């Protein structure tokens, strides 16, 4: 049995633009005044002056989870007070650091512990 809590299907385009040198860059979300600084740890050729792309990817996972939970809860008439997430992900750095063609550049395991009140 399928339940459609959002009767109208919509498509939204999201965009970003960036400028940078080396592994550091400044990302600007389209239609926003926000600026997202990005850098990498020295092991990846950066200066660690800002969160890494991996940190932002993991932050996006928990942030999207919270936003999605809040939207679905609202549609179902459920009030959610607070969220706490702990996320861990395994990544084989052989591709990123060593250029290995035998390794997988994707997260191998992602675990999320969420506490929702």
Question: Where are the model-predicted features located?
Answer:
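Extended beta-strand/beta-hairpin segments
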Residues: 1-59, 69-117
């Amino acid at each position: 049995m399928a339940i459609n809590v959002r009767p109208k299907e919509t498509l939204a385009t999201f965009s970003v633009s960036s400028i940078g040198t080396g592994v550091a860059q400044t990302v600007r979300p389209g239609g926003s005044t926000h600026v997202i600084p990005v850098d990498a740890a020295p092991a990846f050729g950066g200066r660690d002056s800002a969160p890494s792309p991996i940190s932002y990817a993991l932050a996006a996972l928990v942030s999207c989870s919270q936003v999605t939970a809040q939207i679905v809860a609202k549609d179902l008439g459920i009030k959610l007070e607070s969220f706490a997430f702990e996320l861990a992900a395994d990544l084989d750095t052989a591709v990123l650091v060593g250029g290995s063609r035998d390794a997988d550049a994707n997260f191998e395991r992602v675990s999320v512990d969420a506490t929702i009140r």
